[in-house]
């Protein structure tokens, strides 16, 4: 799948998204831009299945982590309707 996972600087370093990901796409890395001194990172996007559990787990109302589904997923979702 070709999904894109973007982490934004509104991340508060809580690790909820990392713990919610069933395919271990996300990890925390050091970052001085927030109180927790860490930010989510997505080094393994090729393993993303597009479930968006990371988005649902994010306490910043989906403003910090976003999953953009690839074209093949969008097409298959349209066929299921």
Swiss-Prot record:
EC number: 1.97.1.12
Membrane topology summary: Peripheral membrane protein
InterPro entries attached to this UniProt entry: 4Fe4S_Fe-S-bd, 4Fe4S_Fe_S_CS, PSI_iron-sulfur_center, PSI_PsaC
GO terms for MF: 4 iron, 4 sulfur cluster binding; electron transfer activity; metal ion binding; oxidoreductase activity
Keyword entries, A-Z: 4Fe-4S, Chloroplast, Electron transport, Iron, Iron-sulfur, Membrane, Metal-binding, Oxidoreductase, Photosynthesis, Photosystem I, Plastid, Repeat, Thylakoid, Transport
Positions annotated to bind [4Fe-4S] cluster 1: 11, 14, 17, 58
Thylakoid found in the keyword field: yes
Protein name (record): Photosystem I iron-sulfur center
Gene3D superfamilies: 3.30.70.20
Entry's Gene Ontology cellular component terms: chloroplast thylakoid membrane; photosystem I
Free-text remark on how the cofactor is bound: Binds 2 [4Fe-4S] clusters. Cluster 2 is most probably the spectroscopically characterized electron acceptor FA and cluster 1 is most probably FB.
Family matches, as NCBIfam families: PS_I_psaC
Cofactor: [4Fe-4S] cluster
Function: Apoprotein for the two 4Fe-4S centers FA and FB of photosystem I (PSI); essential for photochemical activity. FB is the terminal electron acceptor of PSI, donating electrons to ferredoxin. The C-terminus interacts with PsaA/B/D and helps assemble the protein into the PSI complex. Required for binding of PsaD and PsaE to PSI. PSI is a plastocyanin-ferredoxin oxidoreductase, converting photonic excitation into a charge separation, which transfers an electron from the donor P700 chlorophyll pair to the spectroscopically characterized acceptors A0, A1, FX, FA and FB in turn.
Reactions catalysed, as given in the entry: reduced [plastocyanin] + hnu + oxidized [2Fe-2S]-[ferredoxin] = oxidized [plastocyanin] + reduced [2Fe-2S]-[ferredoxin]
Location(s) in or outside the cell: Plastid, Chloroplast thylakoid membrane
């Amino acid at each position: 799948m070709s999904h894109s996972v973007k982490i934004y600087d509104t991340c508060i370093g809580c690790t909820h998204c990392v713990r919610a990901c069933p395919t271990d796409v996300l990890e925390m890395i050091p970052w001085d831009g927030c109180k927790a001194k860490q930010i989510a990172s997505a080094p393994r996007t090729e393993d993303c299945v597009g479930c968006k559990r990371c988005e649902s787990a994010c306490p910043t109302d989906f403003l910090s982590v976003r999953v953009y589904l690839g074209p093949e997923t969008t097409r298959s979702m349209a066929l299921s309707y």
